[in-house]
């Protein structure tokens, strides 16, 4: 049963808008969340995904603020994270409210080429923005927690987001190291999590106002860093999954008090049909759980109207960047390998080399070389040895399409493949060597075609103990 701390109730009752009922708020907090997912349009259209899943008993209710987001219902009680289609990266299990911040940042006329996600893990909003950018430009995704960087990286790869650069820093350093470098910044700030009580019944058990105020001080430092990293004319979205004013309106007001008319709040009242139900007088979205039957959430958007002074001297450029641009000969060789052996045309991005590794970097990344240490940049394409090139799994997942050198397998074979097993073929044919294994038109990974079977080349760290095949209801 949900645990609502009396001190929290006393505090939040003073902040609840007059047109909303405290009884309805408490009742909403006690209800389980509706299941929601976001279709990964880097791999499949929403219409094709619905056609794929409706025979398996899924029903789809559109989420008003995300054209590729849906509340879903189906009969099975299995963990969706084990579903074949989830492992493939066809969808992301994402709470509906958390789809709001990227939607607010990427309004229809937005054409952001260089975007920062300041607190990115586990990657729901990062991969949502990657899809909105259609893998164009550069998306820098930062995470302070080392263990969560690994989760972020895994989700970025699973979803086929190829234009990301990952960093592992305290978000407060970005204003210094990457001053006025980004067209747009999203900061989904670490917070008290008051809005998450519907999925974590103990979220408010030990709530205290002192802790809320302490968290808000960190948030103020983070939003200031994000604002300094934003180019003049750019947009910043600040969001939390908490409900109190200290961590929400108070943080935004602090930024405006600090930088005056350089901070221009943008109203979100027309972001989607019904947004006005959650709009504050400032134009922010303060989503109470009973309004849309969702998690509690807060979203604010602002424009940086002019440049502001940096707080510290510009840091020195870092030396010894380990990558160099591929020579014309090297670039031609890797392009030919992908085209001739794999049937993949490489995007017109930067081909970079480190030792015997070939990588694909977003062209926009060149402006960032030497300014900060990056954990991961773009895609690792292949390793090179005296025997030639060997493609990397992540490149296949992100770049392969139906025109590539593929073999389509059925669902039972796909399950076997993802569990690391070789696949026996019904009909023996001439051996074809390296081949891309696909299910439902989306790539699973590489195999070696030996004529009568596929020798599994799935990386060992991606082998699954359990793969769920959702049964057809037909």
From Swiss-Prot:
InterPro entries, alphabetized: Methyltr_RsmF_N, MeTrfase_RsmB-F_NOP2_cat, MeTrfase_RsmB-F_NOP2_dom, Nol1_Nop2_Fmu_2, Nop2p, RCMT, rRNA_ssu_MeTfrase_F, SAM-dependent_MTases_sf
Keyword terms of this UniProt record: Cytoplasm, Methyltransferase, RNA-binding, rRNA processing, S-adenosyl-L-methionine, Transferase
GO cellular component labels: cytoplasm
GO BP annotations listed: rRNA base methylation
EC annotation from Swiss-Prot or TrEMBL: 2.1.1.178
SUPFAM superfamilies from the UniProt entry: S-adenosyl-L-methionine-dependent methyltransferases
A Pfam cross-reference name: YebU_pre-PUA_dom
Binding site for S-adenosyl-L-methionine: 119-125, 143, 170, 188
Compartment(s): Cytoplasm
Active-site residues (renumbered): 241 (nucleophile)
Main location per the UniProt record: cytoplasm
Gene Ontology MF terms: RNA binding; rRNA (cytosine-C5-)-methyltransferase activity
Catalyses which reaction(s): cytidine(1407) in 16S rRNA + S-adenosyl-L-methionine = 5-methylcytidine(1407) in 16S rRNA + S-adenosyl-L-homocysteine + H(+)
Main EC class the enzyme belongs to: transferase
Keyword field contains Methyltransferase: yes
UniProt record similarity statement: Belongs to the class I-like SAM-binding methyltransferase superfamily. RsmB/NOP family.
Main function: Specifically methylates the cytosine at position 1407 (m5C1407) of 16S rRNA.
Name this polypeptide is given: Ribosomal RNA small subunit methyltransferase F
Organism whose genome encodes this protein: Shewanella oneidensis (strain ATCC 700550 / JCM 31522 / CIP 106686 / LMG 19005 / NCIMB 14063 / MR-1)
Gene this protein is translated from: rsmF
